[in-house]
Amino acid sequence: MSVPTQHYDAPGNQMIDIEQPVVRRILDGLPVGTALDAACGTGRHTAYLRELGHEVIGVDASPDMLAQARKRLPDVDFHEADLHRLPLPDRSVDTVVCALALTHVPDLVPVLAEFARVLRPGGSLVVSDAHLLASYLRPALARRPGPDGRPSLLAEYHRPLSAYLAAALPLGFQVRQCEEPRRPPRSLAPDTAPDPLPADMSWELLHWCPEASAAALDDSPVAVIWHFQLDGVRNG
C-alpha cells in the first residue's frame, strides 16, 4: 500500500477537514437517486452518499485506494477505471461527485464531458479541488519512490476559477454554487520547531519557513467547491 493511500483521509488532513463539510452541505440538498463518486479514493464521500440513501457507484484508477474503499463499503459497486472512460451508460446517474482529483488532470474538458455523458438531464455535478492560491507555497509533493528508487512526483495542475467555467459551460453545465473555504488563522510560537517530514518531502517550503508560510497562507482560500447542474435542454 502506498503512503498516500495510508494517510489520504486520516485525521489531520487540513484540506479534507475544510473541503468535506462544504461538499456534504451541498449533497444534503440534492434529491436522492443514483450517484457516482468519481475518483472515489478510499470512499469517504461514497459512504456519505450511502448514508443519504443514494444508490452509489464508485470509480477510481488506484487499486490501493479501491481496496480500502471495498473494505470500508463491501456492498458498494466499485470499478477500477479512468475518469476519461467511465464504465457507465449514458444518462445513468443523477449526481456525480468528484473530490480533490481534477488537479491531477491535465485537461478538464474530456473529463467533464464524461460527467455530462453519464448524468441525466438536470443532474448535479459536485466538484472540489485545491485552490490556485493554495499552491503558491506548496509545489507538487513527492510521492513513493519510482522505478529508480527516487521519489516520484504526482503531477498537479493548479487552475484559476475561470478554467472550470471555460470547460463546464459549453457542455451545458450551469453554476448553482461556488464556495472558496478559507484556511483558518494559526499562530506559531517563535521557538516552535516544525513537525518532521518524510525524507522525500524534506524540501517543502512550508516545513522550512513555517512562520512566513503561515503568515502568507492565513485566511487564504484552500479549496474551491462547485455545484453544477446539467441543463436538460442542452443535454437532450
What are these regions (language model features)?
Residues 84-96:
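A short acidic, Gly/Pro-enriched loop at the edge of an enzyme's catalytic core
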Residues 95-108:
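A short SAM/SAH-binding and catalytic strip from SAM-dependent methyltransferases
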Residues 109-121:
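A short glycine-rich, Lys/Arg-flanked "PGG" loop and its adjoining helix->strand segment in the class I
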Residues 1-31, 44-48, 65-68, 72, 124-149, 155, ...:
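Conserved class I S-adenosyl-L-methionine
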Residues 156-178:
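Short alpha-helix
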Residues 34-85:
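Class I SAM-dependent methyltransferase SAM/SAH-binding core
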Residues 175-236:
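A C-terminal cap/extension of S-adenosyl-L-methionine-dependent methyltransferases
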